[in-house]
């Protein structure tokens, strides 16, 4: 029997593979056919126009047709070069037929076989003859884009309130930028523009607006283009970097090391910054820069903070079929959370199931009708979470009302007529009551969830999204998904000069209520986006630690001091076999009126132990304070080093013990989550927690007397 099952399983796998390949092949054929058609339409449109030869030469249409003839064996690098021409900012390329080719070209490139990691060295060497020279016209084009972006920002500033506009102008040195750009016939000082561009990355409210971001990006592009155009030996530097990458790729693929990741990331960043070897850059990042954070939260844990019983009383006062109804209604039921499988975003249903019991009196002329109604209530509120925040749909509700008529008060004859009329109109009245109840319930759910959605979005935007957008460090990938029983988050954090994770995370061995898998690259990359170049005072550090732990650290803020972080890798983590090394890098340190302006590194190494009831980190040796590049220290250096060691030993304690994880606010009542998984190796730190068992249900005794 086992052989039969195995045979059918094998057949199913083969059939699935064939169907998947057939689907991919059809997609490739469709993309190629679409590209051929759009190229033919472009050729017919160009025809014998006087500018047609220039367009064909610039867009490399002959090379494109040659690669189309190769089908799936087309050279991705050459196709990428053609795509770059169609995607450039050359005037006229916004016309419909050029746009059609560009769109089809992108689709076709996506269907071509991707480069493998072992092909990267060969690819780097093959890119050496393809240096893209930057001309003066390229510099002028980027300057025009910068001027246009500045004009739009100028308009925004003119429309803003005077006090706010003045604050923004001062923060980004607006007057200095205008002065640099106003110099007629002279190129602005590129170092000055580069310094101004950094100011647009400050965490100041408002700098996330499109107009500020556009100026920041245009400044970066213009400065990079102008620098490359004025470079004395761009070919030598370009070929040297490609040779270095070809040498480093194999060792990094076999045994990824953080030093190699930093080296490769910087070289790829240089190529990307100056628009060189785009296909190599894309292929290298695809192979060696993968998501570096995976988060999973179980439905059961989410329900522990959301699910609740409902017991509410409200007055009834409405008119149904001409009868004024007054009384009270009591809603009892339960609010529960239900995850909906979704690959595009996190889909969450908030469900309300219960019933409403009402006791009311209906008034219609001389008649009074006493009744009791029971309404079943089922309401659904859909929430969706993606990289822009939390959104919601209007709640829907289904209600069904059944009434039981009690006594009818009126004169004898009138009561008889009223009773017959009540029985006749009862189904219609119940239908009206059901519809109105559904509308009220849905409206109440929407009203109550409005503050929840608004607060969640404010927290997400103010504490995460907007600060990173302002500093140009929002994750390249932030994906939310839901399954039947878990919410999953996948994130890739890497800047232009950085790599993320080189490999997949360790597998989760079991089911957890909360699981985090973090690559060491996340610490360095995220810290650069958040803390690069930032000055942190002792007061602010104490506040941050208090926010995280609930209590202030002792001895950290006794004497006034501050540290200004390095712009690159201000904090770095290394995760090896049950060992974690944390390094803090600064470029300026102050103590009261004393100051040193030189690189300093503060580091500590911990061994990590998973014990049955807790996790323990034990520091190996002392906290290390180093001044890179300095062999001899001055008296001031020695005194400052001693002071720093004293302060950071408070932060890097000899032993750190965690007996569980306490969640905030609504989840605090469930108790501490117990750490069940701890893996620290090969650059990854994996943690998994389980919530404590729910307390045993207590029996409710009902007493009655006779």
Regions found by a protein language model. Give the residues of each.
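Short acidic, glycine/tyrosine-flanked loop/strand segments centered on an H-E-D-like triad
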Residues: 389-422
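Bacterial N-terminal signal peptides
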Residues: 10-18
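Boundary at the C-terminal end of the N-terminal hydrophobic targeting segment
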Residues: 22-28
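Bacterial N-terminal signal peptides that target proteins for export
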Residues: 2-10
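Interfacial loop/beta elements and low-complexity acidic/Ser/Thr-rich segments
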Residues: 278-344, 361, 677
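Amphipathic, rod-like alpha-helical scaffolds used for oligomerization/assembly
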Residues: 374-376, 380-389, 394, 421-424, ...
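N-terminal beta-strand/beta-hairpin edge segment
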Residues: 335-390, 561, 569-605
């Amino acid at each position: 029997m086992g052989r039969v099952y195995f045979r059918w399983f094998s057949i199913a796998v083969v059939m699935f593979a064939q169907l998947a390949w057939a689907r991919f092949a059809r997609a490739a054929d469709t993309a190629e056919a679409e590209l051929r058609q759009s190229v033919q339409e472009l050729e017919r449109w160009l025809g014998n126009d006087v500018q047609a030869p220039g367009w064909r030469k610039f867009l490399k249409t002959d090379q494109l047709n040659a690669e189309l003839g190769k089908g799936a064996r087309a050279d991705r690098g050459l196709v990428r070069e053609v795509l770059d021409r169609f995607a450039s900012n050359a005037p006229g390329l916004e016309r419909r037929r050029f746009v059609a080719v560009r769109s089809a070209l992108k689709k076709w490139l996506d269907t071509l076989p991707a480069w493998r990691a072992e092909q990267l060295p060969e690819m780097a060497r093959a890119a050496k003859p393809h240096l893209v020279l930057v001309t003066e016209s390229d510099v002028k084009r980027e300057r025009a884009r910068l001027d246009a972006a500045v004009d739009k920002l100028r308009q925004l500033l003119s429309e803003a309130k005077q006090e706010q506009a003045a604050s923004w102008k001062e923060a980004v040195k607006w007057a200095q930028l205008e002065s640099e750009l106003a110099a007629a016939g002279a190129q602005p000082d590129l170092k000055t523009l580069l310094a101004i561009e950094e100011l647009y990355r400050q965490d100041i409210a408002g700098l996330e607006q499109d107009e500020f971001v556009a100026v920041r990006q245009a400044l970066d592009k213009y400065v990079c283009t102008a620098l490359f155009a004025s470079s004395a030996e761009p070919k030598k530097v370009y070929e040297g970097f490609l040779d270095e990458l070809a040498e480093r790729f194999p060792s990094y693929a076999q045994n990824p090391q953080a030093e190699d990741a930093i080296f490769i990331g910087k070289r790829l960043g240089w190529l990307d910054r100056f628009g060189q070897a785009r296909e190599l850059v894309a292929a290298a990042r695809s192979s060696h820069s993968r998501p570096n954070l995976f988060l999973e939260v179980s439905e059961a844990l989410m329900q522990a903070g959301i699910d609740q019983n409902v017991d509410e009383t409200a007055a009834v006062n409405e008119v149904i079929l001409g009868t004024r109804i007054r009384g009270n209604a009591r809603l009892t039921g339960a609010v529960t959370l239900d995850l909906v499988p979704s690959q595009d975003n996190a889909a969450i249903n908030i469900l309300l199931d219960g019933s409403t019991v009402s006791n009311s009196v209906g008034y219609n002329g001389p008649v009074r009708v006493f009744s009791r109604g029971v309404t079943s209530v089922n309401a659904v509120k859909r929430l969706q979470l993606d990289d822009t925040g939390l959104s919601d749909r209007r709640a829907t509700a289904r209600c069904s009302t059944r009434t039981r008529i009690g006594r009818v008060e009126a004169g004898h004859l009138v009561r008889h007529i009223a009773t017959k009329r009540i029985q006749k109109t009862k189904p219609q009245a119940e239908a009206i009551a059901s519809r109105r109840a559904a509308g009220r319930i849905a409206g109440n759910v929407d009203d109550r969830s409005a503050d929840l959605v608004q607060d969640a979005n404010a927290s997400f935007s103010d504490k995460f999204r907007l600060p990173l957008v302002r500093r140009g460090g929002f994750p390249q990938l932030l994906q939310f998904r839901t399954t039947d029983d878990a919410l999953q988050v996948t994130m890739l954090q890497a800047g232009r000069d950085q790599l993320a994770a080189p490999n997949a995370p360790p597998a989760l061995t079991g089911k957890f209520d909360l699981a985090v898998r973090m690559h060491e690259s996340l610490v360095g990359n995220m810290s650069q986006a958040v803390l690069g170049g930032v000055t942190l005072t002792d007061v602010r550090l104490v506040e941050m630690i208090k926010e995280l732990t609930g209590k202030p650290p002792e001895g950290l803020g006794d004497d006034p001091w501050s540290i200004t972080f390095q712009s690159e890798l201000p904090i770095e983590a290394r995760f090896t076999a049950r060992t974690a090394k944390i390094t803090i890098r600064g470029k300026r340190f102050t103590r009261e009126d004393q100051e040193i302006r030189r690189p300093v590194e503060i580091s500590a190494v911990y061994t990590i132990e998973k014990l049955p009831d807790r996790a323990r980190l034990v520091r190996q040796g002392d906290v290390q304070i180093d001044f890179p590049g300095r062999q001899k220290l001055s008296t001031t250096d020695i005194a400052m080093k001693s002071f720093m060691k004293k302060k950071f030993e408070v932060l890097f304690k000899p032993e750190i013990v965690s007996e569980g994880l306490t969640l905030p606010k609504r989840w605090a009542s469930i108790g501490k989550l117990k750490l069940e998984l701890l893996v620290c190796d090969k650059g990854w730190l994996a943690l998994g927690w389980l919530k404590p068992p729910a307390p045993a249900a207590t029996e409710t005794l009902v007493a009655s007397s006779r």
